[in-house]
Amino acid sequence: MELILYVCKKVNIMENISQPQLPMGVSFLNVAHTYVPNTKVECHYTIPFGMKSSTRDWIGIFKVNTSSIRDYETFVWAVPPENAGERSISHCSVQFQAYYLPHPGEQQYHFRYVDQCGSVRGCSEAFVFGEPQPMEEMVTLEDEDSCLDMLLIVPKATFLQNQLEMAQKERNDLMRARLALEEEVISKEKRICYLEAALDISEKTCFSLKEQCEDLVTREQIAIGERNLLNCQEAELRERILQLESEIQSMNKKMQENDRVLEGTVAIKFSLETEKGELKQRLGETTVEIERYQLQVDSLREKLRSSQDMLSSSQQKALLMGEELASMSSIRDCTISDLHKSRLETADLAIKVSDLSVKFKEGMGQWWQEKTALNHSMEAKRDQIVNLKAEKLSLDNSLQEERSQRHALQCKLNQETDARQVQLSENRRELSELKSALKVTQMEKEQLIEERQEIHQYVRRLEERLDKLADEKWKEDKMLMEDKTDSSPPTLSVDLSDSDDESPGDEGVSQQLGPCSLDEQDLSLNLPVFPCEPQKVVINQPAPIACQLQPLPEDNPDSW
């Protein structure tokens, strides 16, 4: 029965190991119902994750229903777990020595885990200490390994101890395997978390790279649009600059014309002011002259009054001095003539004074009209000058802006011009090299033309010499034929090899020229047919001598 109970307990232990629970406190494992006294007792327990263990924690054997932790039978210090820093359950075990255990009996005990603060963190199932029965001390075993039919009789305690050690060893192996699997699971979970984090980071990076790529594409499109817009704006600005330059030139012309008009107006004003001064001076002179004439008129009036007084006195005297009338008649005539003259002078002076007053009034009216007209024109010119100054200021501001823009465009244009200048210098250098090469080829061409002309001259001299030699041979043959008129005229063959012997210098020159040949059409001689001879005379000529070099197309003067 005890063996069956032990097997059942072992099955329960394996089930507990295969299906662990995660209690909030300390859990005790492999607690038997009965422990044999005078043998050490091994206690297995688990510490859950999150519980802080200490070397001051202890495990005691208490009687069931004992309330105080001081009523323990025996205790041992708890062993701190080896994997306390890991996120898993810690498995530990302690041993109670045999001589500290309670005596056997029916009293039930259990294990308690007490921390350093005196709090009970876990209790085990109840168990008892009892002696084994005498009938059950021996166990019969069959020897399955040996071939003999033998029965082994061993003590039950030894058998149970061996079974317990085997179970403990198997349990330890299973616990190690479980811990290894748990560690592997934890490492795999960490690896999975790390890979998930790396995947999230890579996805975020990929998403950010896609956004950056799209942003770069949009920026590129925007930059292309801005570049096209800037090109359009640059073209518009160039047109605007040209238009503004033309407007500035026209405004400069207008300003020059306005300056000339202003200068003319200032000159007119100055001349009018001078004329005004002259008129004032003339007016003063006229006033002085009028006053002088007035004084003269007054003096003449006084003279007339005195003359009238004198006339009245003279009449009185005439009445009184009738006697002296005859003597004074001459004096009276003179006085009358003087009076007449004075009256005429007075009338002339009055006419002059009236003319001068009329002229003065006309001059003053004309001067006032001219002054008002000049004032109006000066005010209009002032307004025009103010407007022109404001317009000039605005044009100066716009011109300054256009100059700044033009300066920026000029900088760009200078850069492009520098690049084009560099390219132009390279093109010029290449052109100079091509020109030098062309000059060299032209010089070579001229040399070839000169050599060709020399060859043509030499060929012409050879043709003339051959013609002379042919004429001489023909004359000699003719003379021979005349001497042999009676005989039948065979076909004469005249060998001109002697001509080669006669001109060794020409042969040397032909050797210097190399393989040369004359055109047969140019050197062929049409010999005349004699009417007295029934057959033709054939003259054997030497091989044609001419330059075999064909003329190059570039040497042809028609192809130049």
Curated annotation (Swiss-Prot):
| Region (Disordered), start-end ranges | 480-517
User: Record's superkingdom?
Assistant: Eukaryota
Pfam families linked to this entry: CALCOCO1 (PF07888), SKICH (PF17751)
Q: Which gene encodes it?
A: calcoco1-a
Q: Which family does it belong to?
A: Belongs to the CALCOCO family.
Instruction: Show the InterPro entries listed in the entry.
Output: CALCOCO1-like, SKICH, UBA_autophagy_assoc_protein
What GO biological process terms are annotated to this protein in UniProt?
positive regulation of transcription by RNA polymerase II
Q: For this UniProt entry, what's an example GO CC term?
A: nucleus
Tell me the GO molecular function terms.
Answer: transcription coactivator activity
Instruction: Explain the purpose of this protein.
Output: May function as a coactivator for aryl hydrocarbon and nuclear receptors.
Compartments it resides in: Cytoplasm; Nucleus
The name on file for this protein is Calcium-binding and coiled-coil domain-containing protein 1-A
Provide the coiled-coil residue spans. Answer: 156-192, 367-480
Alphabetical UniProt keywords: Coiled coil, Cytoplasm, Nucleus
Q: Which residue windows does the record flag with biased composition (Low complexity)?
A: 487-496
